[in-house]
Amino acid sequence: MRFYQEDKKMSKEFPITISSWTLGDQCKFEDRVIAAKNAGYEGIGLRAETYVDALNEGLFDKDILAILDKHGMKVTEVEYIVQWAEEHRSYEQKYKEQLCFHMCELFDVKQINCGLMENYSVEYTAQKLRELCQRAGKYIIGVEPMPYSGIPDMKKGWAVVKAADCENAKLIMDTWHWVRANQPVDLSVIEDIPADKIVSKIGRA
């Protein structure tokens, strides 16, 4: 019984969330929420593009919140800011970034997941991350290392986050990408990273 209660407490503090990518992009917003609910999840991730799809259905913010409330679900993850290290960011990327900030405010989400496909030096990337963190203000910027990206592993990810030296710059540790980057299973890669700098630990089916 004690373990069950502890599990429920942990689940309440950190809702079990299904990624926006897992649910795909070819369904209506309410169908997405229902599918996640029926599968036993407590929260859904939402990409900026998926949020725009919901608006394109004719939904307003109040409608989206009503659907979530109707099914006892929450949006618990917002993503995905990219190309934030470009010297001259496009208006589309600037708008998407602002949209992610709005989504965090709307859904009371504290963190935005971010990736970077382009490969730059640690120093340059850290400077651009610092600028992103300043724009994000109160929101956490979760940097996600991916083996096919410009931040391919936790080693470079931590070097960038450490050099950026921002309180709201943190790392996402995704076991799916971890395995595909051939990182050691003994976790030696993260032994020098403070625990409070790893903001998410994600596993995938």
Which residues are covered by each model-predicted region?
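N-terminal pre-domain/capping segments
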Residues: 2-109, 166-170, 196
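Short gly/ser/thr-rich secondary-structure transition/capping motifs
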Residues: 24-26, 179-184
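Active-site acidic/histidine proton-transfer and metal-coordination neighborhood
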Residues: 30, 67-74, 84-173, 179-180
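Conserved small/polar residues in nucleotide/adenosyl-binding loops
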Residues: 205
